Structure formats: structure tokens, C-alpha cells
């Protein structure tokens, strides 16, 4: 075959058609004699290989909807829809299961790495208040929205756990959950599995070791009030009454009547607990100095050191009965020293 004829045949292969006369003399392939292109167009090839469910606008909308809802990549969302025959609910479940597998695998590889950073989360609803701590490796990840959503899920899980405790209160109740207990709590009505499954998902997405460190909860009846404070506070983007930060405190007060300024008073008491780190409440009769320096009521008041906290509280007609203080990452330095 001549060079010119070969080049003409290549031209046919690229364009899909050409006048038969342009090929010059000589025998032609049967497909060319019938006037058919040698190759299908690129668009036809793409449609054939992409799966029939992607050929309609509604299917592409499904892909976009799954992407927006889950946050996973287009490639993974497309694979999920293909695997599940275009069923959106099944595709979402499939994605979460795959991500969980990857997360558990990554968690096993990262286990043991130090988690000194993270966030404290404080959530109040009705007569219930919870304080949680979730740790990660770097401050950079603690500022990531996905990590903050994990803290939110842990706070909500703890709140639901506390609200499900059917006890008749004559006084306040307070409880703590360690890492293991916290991990086993249900993830919530809109989430599958437990909080440890949500932890695995977050580890898979963010690539750092993380732990659900601890939680505290307080329930109060009438006649009690819980003051709260979070240092460096920022509000959750999707849950207005969840506050995030590096330090958090709850202060339980008993009061004979509901006062208009209780919220401000509770915040100031929480600030004192965060700043002065008392170890116990103490009493109004404690003398300042010595061991009393660790007792809340005999400590110099944080915002006015000329008086004790007890002297500040007394005119307001409330009694401080208990408190909880969380500092993000506390205990890690001591563990390193050991």
C-alpha cells in the first residue's frame, strides 16, 4: 500500500468519514464501501461505558445530591450509585460502610500517636447540660469543620444519654463518662451505629489519630441553675446552642428564686473556675490562704482579687454547690513525663 493511501486511511480513522474518491484507486474495506466510519464518536463511546443510569438529567441530579449530602468525592459517589443501581439511600449507606472500613484501618495504623489538641464542647438544653472533650493531634485539624461536627455528635449523644435517664430529681445529679463508655453511646437518631463508628469515619476523612476522651453531664430540678463558660468560644455552625473552645466549666448553683441576672452570674462563675482551677467548692467560713487557695469560695475572685469569690456570690442570693472543669489535653503532659 502506498504511503499516500495509508495517510488517507488514517484520515478516515480520525474523522469517521471522507469521500470514497479521496482514497484513490484500489480495493476498499467492506465497512468503507458501505459508507460507515471505522470508529464510533467519542460521545457514543462515553455513553456506552458510563452506565445507563448516568444518561439522564435526573441521574446526574442524584449524583450531585449524594455528593452534597455525604461530602464524598464524585468518583466515590458515582461508584456507590452504580453499585446500588441508582438507589440514593442504599448508595449513602454503602459510602458510609466503605468509609468506616477505611477509617478503622487508618485508626489502627495511627493508634498510639499523641492527641494533645482538640476541642471542648458545651451543650445546654432544658434542665440538662453536657461537657465533652474530643482530642486530635494538631490544632489545624481541631479547626476543621468535620472535626467540629464530630464534637457535635458526641455532645448530642451524651445529651440524649442523660435525657433518657428516668430519675425523679429532688436535687441535682452529675455524672461522668470515660472514653470507653462514651464510645459505646448510640450515634443518634439520624446516624447509624455508635459514636466510635463516627470516630472512625472522622479519622478516615482527616487522617489523624483522635479519641473521644470524656464527658460530664448535669441535670437540675427547679431551684437549681447551671452556669457555664467556654474560653475561646466559637459556636457550632449547625447547632446554635453548642459552644466549642479549649476550656469549659459548669457551675451548679442553688437559688430560691429565678433571677434575671443568673445567666451573667453563671458565666462569671464559670470564668473563675476556668481561670483559677479550684479543686473543691469549700465553704464561706474558709479563711483565705494555705489549702484554702484550692477551694473555690475562698479564692480571690478572678475579676476582682480584692474580695473572695464567696464574698462576690453572697449578695446575689445563690449558693454554689458544685462545678465541673475541663481543660483540653490536660493529663497528656503528665503521661509523657511518666
Curated annotation (Swiss-Prot):
One of its GO terms (biological process) is regulation of mitochondrial translation. Gene3D superfamilies: DNA helicase RuvA subunit, C-terminal domain (1.10.8.10), Elongation factor Ts, dimerisation domain (3.30.479.20). It is found in: Mitochondrion. PROSITE patterns: EF_TS_1 (PS01126), EF_TS_2 (PS01127). The modification Phosphoserine is found at residue 283. Its main location: mitochondrion. InterPro entries: EF-Ts_dimer_sf, Transl_elong_EFTs/EF1B, Transl_elong_EFTs/EF1B_dimer, Transl_elong_Ts_CS, UBA-like_sf. SUPFAM superfamilies: Elongation factor Ts (EF-Ts), dimerisation domain, UBA-like. One of its GO terms (molecular function) is translation elongation factor activity. Residues 1-55 form a transit peptide. GO terms for cellular component: mitochondrial matrix. The modification N6-succinyllysine is found at residues 89, 146, 205. Keywords: Elongation factor, Mitochondrion, Phosphoprotein, Protein biosynthesis, Transit peptide. It comes from the Eukaryota. Associates with the EF-Tu.GDP complex and induces the exchange of GDP to GTP. It remains bound to the aminoacyl-tRNA.EF-Tu.GTP complex up to the GTP hydrolysis stage on the ribosome. Belongs to the EF-Ts family. HAMAP family: EF_Ts. This is Elongation factor Ts, mitochondrial. It comes from Bos taurus. The lineage of its organism: Eukaryota, Metazoa, Chordata, Craniata, Vertebrata.
